[in-house]
Amino acid sequence: MSIYHDEVEIEDFEYDEEEEMYYYPCPCGDRFQISKEELIEGEEVATCPSCSLVIKVIYDPEMFKAEEDEESALNEKLGDLKLEKN
């Protein structure tokens, strides 16, 4: 079992859309980080690349599952449209 420095709600993280990463300030001066992909897979621990601290991320896994399902449906529709054009 991990010992968490803190428990932080996902809403308190900063989201970088380009990198699809969530960031939260670490006491060491760097930032805790966790990727959107890790959250979709059910990961709940954000790590700091500069020190040994970890935090538990509080979030609703269903929120990310629904978003993943939406993306899959959109990609499928785009694929169908490309086939229709040819």
From Swiss-Prot:
Pathway: Protein modification; peptidyl-diphthamide biosynthesis. Its cofactor is Fe(2+). Pfam families: Zn_ribbon_CSL (PF05207). GO terms for biological process: protein histidyl modification to diphthamide; tRNA wobble base 5-methoxycarbonylmethyl-2-thiouridinylation. GO terms for molecular function: ferrous iron binding; iron chaperone activity; oxidoreductase activity. Residues 4-60 form the DPH-type MB domain. It catalyses: [3Fe-4S](1+)-[protein] + Fe(2+)-[Dph3] = [3Fe-4S](0)-[protein] + Fe(3+)-[Dph3]; 2 [3Fe-4S](0)-[protein] + 2 Fe(2+)-[Dph3] + NADH = 2 [4Fe-4S](1+)-[protein] + 2 [Dph3] + NAD(+) + H(+). The keyword Isomerase does not apply. Keywords: Iron, Metal-binding, Oxidoreductase. One of its GO terms (cellular component) is cytosol. The keyword Oxidoreductase applies. Fe cation binds at C26, C28, C48, C51. Required for the first step of diphthamide biosynthesis, a post-translational modification of histidine which occurs in elongation factor 2. Dph1 and Dph2 transfer a 3-amino-3-carboxypropyl (ACP) group from S-adenosyl-L-methionine (SAM) to a histidine residue, the reaction is assisted by a reduction system comprising Dph3 and a NADH-dependent reductase. Acts as an electron donor to reduce the Fe-S cluster in Dph1-Dph2 keeping the [4Fe-4S] clusters in the active and reduced state. The DPH-type metal-binding (MB) domain can also bind zinc. However, iron is the physiological binding partner as zinc binding impairs the protein electron donor function. Component of the 2-(3-amino-3-carboxypropyl)histidine synthase complex composed of Dph1, Dph2, Dph3 and a NADH-dependent reductase. Belongs to the DPH3 family. This is Diphthamide biosynthesis protein 3. It comes from Drosophila melanogaster. The gene is Dph3.
